[in-house]
Curated annotation (Swiss-Prot):
Superkingdom to which the source organism belongs: Bacteria
Pfam assignment, any one: ADK
Gene from which this protein is expressed: adk
Domains: entry comment: Consists of three domains, a large central CORE domain and two small peripheral domains, NMPbind and LID, which undergo movements during catalysis. The LID domain closes over the site of phosphoryl transfer upon ATP binding. Assembling and dissambling the active center during each catalytic cycle provides an effective means to prevent ATP hydrolysis. The LID domain is a solvent-exposed domain that is much shorter in Mycobacterium than in many other bacteria like E.coli.
Residues where AMP binds: T31, R36, D57, L58, V59, G85, Y86, P87, R88, Q92, R129, R140
Listed GO CC annotations: cytoplasm; cytosol; peptidoglycan-based cell wall; plasma membrane
Annotated source species: Mycobacterium tuberculosis (strain ATCC 25618 / H37Rv)
Pathway assigned to this chain's UniProt record: Purine metabolism; AMP biosynthesis via salvage pathway; AMP from ADP: step 1/1
Identification of the protein by name: Adenylate kinase
Locations listed in the record: Cytoplasm
Enzyme Commission numbers on file: 2.7.4.3
PROSITE patterns cross-referenced by the UniProt entry: ADENYLATE_KINASE
Length: 181
């Protein structure tokens, strides 16, 4: 099963990605983790990504796409994966579609974790991260709405909405139901 997780910062995608991957026996692929691992290993892509991250810039889509494409070549991803944090734009979604088409496959499901902005603010402020000020959080939500929300329209035929308010286990049960598991 090939599953994408979408939702604003603080919706619980990372937590649910780990649980879903474990339950379904497929890898969780997080672009943040891909960046970290490639940087640590000093790969060509990692060195290039580090230049952008060190400058405080977003890693360009073509480089992110290349990292994801490279990761999808690993044998553990042959039977499926949970993608967390990618794609972030329609441009990246189209690139992902091409990657999967070359492999003769496609996305099976797209889960959107939905949470009100009030709940997100509370969750993010509760994490205690230095950069989680109200202004920064509100800006991240705006960026999500502007950049990532168009993906909801792009994936409308595969999209399943998951109410992400509740305990970790309640949200996990809803996510499994949305996947028909």
């Amino acid at each position: 099963m090939r599953v994408l997780l979408l939702g604003p910062p603080g919706a619980g995608k990372g937590t649910q990605a780990v649980k879903l991957a474990e339950k379904l026996g497929i890898p969780q692929i997080s672009t943040g983790e891909l960046f970290r691992r490639n940087i640590e290993e000093g790969t060509k892509l990692g060195v290039e990504a580090k230049r952008y991250l060190d400058a405080g810039d977003l890693v360009p889509s073509d480089l992110t796409n290349e990292l994801v494409d490279d990761r999808l070549n690993n044998p553990d991803a042959a039977n499926g994966f949970i993608l967390d944090g990618y794609p972030r734009s329609v441009e990246q979604a189209k690139a992902l579609h091409e990657m999967l088409e070359r492999r003769g496959t496609d996305i099976d499901a797209v889960l959107e974790f939905r949470v009100s902005e009030e709940v997100l603010l509370e969750r993010l402020k509760g994490r205690g991260r230095a950069d989680d000020t109200d202004d920064v959080i509100l800006n991240r939500m705006k960026v999500y709405r502007d950049e990532t929300a168009p993906l909801l329209e792009y994936y409308r035929d595969q999209l399943k909405t998951v109410d992400a308010v509740g305990t970790m286990d309640e949200v996990f049960a809803r996510a499994l139901r949305a996947l028909g598991k």
